């Protein structure tokens, strides 16, 4: 997909990993995805914030170009909450105003964990929770416009809410971001932002045609994420947002994660929302400090599609 220069409100636009040892996180993710990092913090500042850049050829449903291109894709930083050393991946959603988003979150019954603040000259951000406790963040852009590369190998491809209260989540996120849900196959549901497909067609005029050829459900061009019910046999799993990165080979990525000291939480499998024209192969991994994430590979059954 071509490099991004901003998003529209309600779209996932950035992810970062909060790590007790960010330098170790840089080593792991650099080895896994081939990311190159630059520290955005001054040497005298407390904590570190390493912005990751990725170069990759297009190989997704959105783009068949094999020209190499690159851009900022994510970051690895110090865990900001001293009392919470747990490593985790954080999802950010684009907003016009972090302060107005905070008001919508409160009105919808969510929580404001960290009030809106300016993160250097990068963005204005805040940390919220939905009524079930799933944490998420917002991104009011300043000098940094979020992820410049998405959907390509090594870049963000999907964000998912895992929750026990699907109905409550529908109501909350509709109020905060204007989302609705649609069926996306395999019994799954996607978060759809009306009009997002029109925005994407600025980058890819044939987007809807390509999605139809791939067997994507009607309205999939508006999907910005998914909603997954937490199973009853997982009582200790809290509500949370998860991140998925595109890769060239999910099986090889899982093996490489182990070599780098990570863990395979869910071995590679073919996702139930695969279709007759493509397979989504997915694995869930953990980094050495405990942050979890998924890696997926879009595998076209038709060699003319996304290959």
Each model region followed by its residue ranges:
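Core segments of cupin and vicinal oxygen chelate
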Residues: 2, 7-9, 16-68, 107, ...
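Active-site-adjacent scaffolding segments
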Residues: 4, 40-154
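Vicinal oxygen chelate
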Residues: 1-7, 11-20, 50-53, 78-104, 110-152, 183-219, 229-234, ...
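Glycine-centered structural positions embedded in regular secondary structure
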Residues: 74-77, 224-229
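Residue-level detector of beta-propeller blades
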Residues: 37, 72-73, 112-113, 181, ...
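A compositionally biased, intrinsically disordered/low-complexity signal enriched
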Residues: 28-29, 33, 93, 105, ...
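Short loop/beta submotifs within extracellular cysteine-rich repeat domains
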Residues: 35-37, 59, 100-101, 181-182, ...
